[in-house]
């Protein structure tokens, strides 16, 4: 990227940007919800489109001069619909959380019952956490995973739905590493008369590539972010059946937001275009391959992988038998240039600020070119750091930097 202007006009901000660039280039990024966008996506986000206000929708704006930005929003919508084979797409949500909020407010009233996945079992704040708007405005009935398999027990799920008769059932997760049976959930929704909403933010890229069953044929509403496995800009999107299109669009604008971010929508259009290319399927397959090898290697080192493995891009590691908390492991790994995040595990006994586990994912490292052999090295680094936490780890930091230097991101 060309930062010549900001380098001259604001050296303080420029130095921070360069510092973060160096961190990304020299660290192994294992945050499951992060990725590295293409330069094309970045260029779209930094384009002239940022200057245009465009409240409303293409062909029906509240400002003049929108005939150009209308084109980029239409392009983003059409590419999104083609990518996911959806009837309707709204690409205006600023984030996944706002996309979820827009769906709730489109068809629910405060106090209605929502069934959502427990946060400690892998759900998301917006699926009913009591500290989130969703938990404050709606009556939340949480479901979780089996204490035996640490996977969703669909029969227990069904029984709970029959008991509480929710107005909406939300599926999807932020820390669940297994395939979700959307067909089965659709059957349960039909049985209890509930709307079906799927938050596919984490797995959207895998769905687009055909590596995870798509929720689109089954769900009334599907939300997503456009970063994570889609490798696009920070933002959200909503897909729905055509019969709900007007309700969703009204809920996003004027219900939830004012002017859309046209430069981000342009980045989304570029992202969807990239995901429609054949090589994106190869990339997504490598994400999954890397995650599986990573999980297998960590298991060999004695780490316990929640649910026994992974079917997607992430893995949740229970550190209990390693006698270290998620918080301490996060800081320890960060000290050698490996970025992961502390995370609760099913049936968590520690505070969410401490945790018994860490969550790790492979989208970012796959984007920079890591394959199976590199993931084995990363597993070795992690094991060494945890096992030798009281020793000098400077040699591991050096090896991490050397590995990263062979796989530059933007250089």
From Swiss-Prot:
- Whether Cytoplasm counts among this entry's keywords is yes
Query: Which residues in this protein are found as N6-(pyridoxal phosphate)lysine?
Result: 228
Which molecular-function annotation in GO is an example for this chain?
A: pyridoxal phosphate binding
Q: Name the residues annotated as site: Plays an important role in substrate specificity.
A: 227
Q: What is its EC number?
A: 2.1.2.1
Q: Which UniProt keywords apply?
A: Amino-acid biosynthesis, Cytoplasm, One-carbon metabolism, Pyridoxal phosphate, Transferase
Alphabetical GO biological process terms: glycine biosynthetic process from serine; tetrahydrofolate interconversion
Gene3D superfamilies xrefs: Aspartate Aminotransferase, domain 1, Type I PLP-dependent aspartate aminotransferase-like (Major domain)
> Which positions in this protein are listed as binding (6S)-5,6,7,8-tetrahydrofolate?
119, 123-125, 351-353
Amino-acid biosynthesis: is it a keyword of this entry?
A: yes
State its location(s): Cytoplasm
Where does it sit, as one GO cellular component term? Answer: cytosol
Q: Which reaction does it catalyse?
A: (6R)-5,10-methylene-5,6,7,8-tetrahydrofolate + glycine + H2O = (6S)-5,6,7,8-tetrahydrofolate + L-serine
- Pathway per the UniProt entry: One-carbon metabolism; tetrahydrofolate interconversion; Amino-acid biosynthesis; glycine biosynthesis; glycine from L-serine: step 1/1
Which cofactors, by name? pyridoxal 5'-phosphate
Q: Which domain of life is it from?
A: Bacteria
What sort of enzyme, by top EC class, is this? transferase
Q: What is its main location?
A: cytoplasm
The family assignment reads: Belongs to the SHMT family.
Kindly give the PANTHER family that the UniProt entry links to this protein. Answer: SERINE HYDROXYMETHYLTRANSFERASE (PTHR11680), SERINE HYDROXYMETHYLTRANSFERASE 1 (PTHR11680:SF35)
- What is this protein's function? Catalyzes the reversible interconversion of serine and glycine with tetrahydrofolate (THF) serving as the one-carbon carrier. This reaction serves as the major source of one-carbon groups required for the biosynthesis of purines, thymidylate, methionine, and other important biomolecules. Also exhibits THF-independent aldolase activity toward beta-hydroxyamino acids, producing glycine and aldehydes, via a retro-aldol mechanism.
Q: How does it assemble?
A: Homodimer.
State the protein's name: Serine hydroxymethyltransferase
Task: Specify the species.
Answer: Clostridium acetobutylicum (strain ATCC 824 / DSM 792 / JCM 1419 / IAM 19013 / LMG 5710 / NBRC 13948 / NRRL B-527 / VKM B-1787 / 2291 / W)
| Gene (UniProt) | glyA
């Amino acid at each position: 990227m060309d930062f010549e202007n900001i380098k001259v006009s604001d050296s303080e901000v420029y130095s921070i940007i360069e510092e973060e660039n160096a961190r990304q280039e020299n660290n192994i990024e294992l945050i499951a919800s992060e990725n590295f966008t293409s330069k094309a996506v970045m260029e779209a986000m930094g384009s002239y489109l940022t200057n245009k206000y465009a409240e409303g929708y293409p062909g029906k704006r509240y400002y003049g001069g929108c005939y150009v930005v209308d084109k980029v929003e239409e392009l983003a919508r059409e590419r999104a619909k083609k990518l996911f084979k959806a009837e309707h797409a709204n690409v205006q949500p600023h984030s996944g959380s706002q996309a979820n909020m827009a769906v709730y407010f489109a068809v629910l009233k405060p106090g209605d019952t929502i069934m959502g996945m427990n946060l400690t079992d892998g759900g998301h704040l917006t699926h009913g956490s009591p500290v989130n708007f969703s938990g404050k405005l709606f009556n939340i009935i949480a479901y979780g995973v089996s204490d035996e398999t640490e996977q969703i027990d669909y029969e227990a799920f069904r029984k709970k739905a029959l008991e509480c008769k929710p107005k909406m059932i939300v599926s999807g997760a932020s820390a669940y590493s297994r395939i979700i049976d959307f067909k089965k959930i659709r059957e349960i929704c039909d049985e209890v008369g509930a709307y079906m909403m799927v938050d596919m933010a984490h797995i959207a890229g895998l769905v687009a590539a055909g590596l995870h069953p798509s929720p689109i044929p089954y769900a009334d509403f599907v939300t997503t972010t456009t970063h994570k496995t889609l490798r696009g800009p920070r933002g959200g999107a909503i897909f729905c059946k055509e019969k709900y299109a007007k309700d969703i669009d009204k809920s996003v604008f004027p219900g939830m937001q004012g002017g859309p971010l046209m430069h981000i929508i342009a980045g989304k259009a570029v992202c969807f275009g990239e995901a429609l290319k054949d090589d994106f399927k190869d990339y997504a397959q490598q994400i999954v391959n890397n995650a599986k090898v990573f999980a297998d290697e960590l298991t060999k080192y004695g780490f316990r992988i929640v649910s026994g493995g992974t079917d997607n891009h992430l893995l949740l590691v229970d550190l209990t038998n390693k006698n270290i908390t998620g918080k301490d492991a996060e800081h320890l790994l960060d000290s050698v240039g490996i970025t992961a995040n502390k995370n609760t595990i099913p049936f968590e006994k520690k505070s969410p600020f401490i945790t018994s586990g860490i969550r790790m994912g492979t989208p970012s490292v796959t984007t920079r070119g890591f394959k199976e052999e590199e993931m084995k090295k990363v597993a070795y680094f992690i094991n060494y750091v945890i096992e030798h936490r009281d020793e000098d780890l400077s040699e591991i930091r050096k090896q991490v930097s050397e590995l990263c230097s062979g796989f530059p991101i933007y250089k």
